[in-house]
A protein has these predicted regions:
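Extracellular loop and loop/strand-boundary signature of outer-membrane beta-barrel proteins
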Residues: 22, 81, 118-123, 158-161
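Outer membrane beta-barrel
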Residues: 1-113, 129, 138-145
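Short linear motifs in intrinsically disordered/low-complexity regions
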Residues: 3, 66, 72, 116, ...
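Detector for outer-membrane/organellar transmembrane beta-barrel domains
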Residues: 128-166
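Short acidic/glycine-rich loop or secondary-structure boundary segments that cap or lie
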Residues: 56, 116, 155-159
Length: 166
């Protein structure tokens, strides 16, 4: 939807197991991706449940450009196999991508609470909750692509909540 000099969009993506029809992603209705985004001259801001930059799927997954084992090959190439984190998709997330400049694109992502379905007791963005951050650069020129990405999981500290290890 155009709103002046910006556009607002959304993605609602659900998944199911093809062998038995059961809902995927822990029973979430839109467990694959559920985000709203605003884009304009300065890039795109995303909010919601999003796959990581260090992933080969989702709206901002950079590894799909360079993965020898894309997501279609199962766990080996899935987002859970390409990141050091316990999660492939992240709840309560903000992400930003500035515009592409001469084939170079950047992205940053921060999740205030990585998994709000299994972690129902902790506060967002506190030492009680698993938090996650990622950043990436992607360069594309014709059929060539180079990706540099990093991620960091700040695991919760339920035994000593006053100590914030992340």
């Amino acid at each position: 939807e155009d709103i002046g000099n910006a556009k607002v969009g959304f993605v609602l993506e659900s998944g199911f197991n093809s062998d038995d029809g059961a809902s995927g992603q822990g029973g979430r209705l839109f467990g694959r991706e559920a985000q709203v985004n605003v884009s304009g001259a300065y890039g795109t801001l995303y909010a919601g449940r999003i796959a990581s930059i260090v992933s080969d799927s989702g709206s901002i997954g950079y590894l799909g450009d360079v993965s020898a084992f894309p997501n279609a090959f199962g766990f080996v190439g899935s987002q859970a196999g390409s990141t050091g984190s316990a999660y492939g998709r992240y709840d309560t997330t903000l992400a930003y991508q500035p515009p592409v400049f001469s084939g170079l694109q950047a992205a940053v992502l921060y999740s205030f609470k990585a998994d709000s379905k299994t972690d129902t007791t902790s506060r967002e963005n506190s030492s009680f909750a698993d938090r996650y951050a990622a950043a990436g650069l992607r360069y594309k020129a014709g059929k060539a692509a180079v990706v540099l990405a990093a991620d960091y999981t700040m695991y919760s500290n339920a035994t000593n909540p006053d100590l914030d290890d992340g």
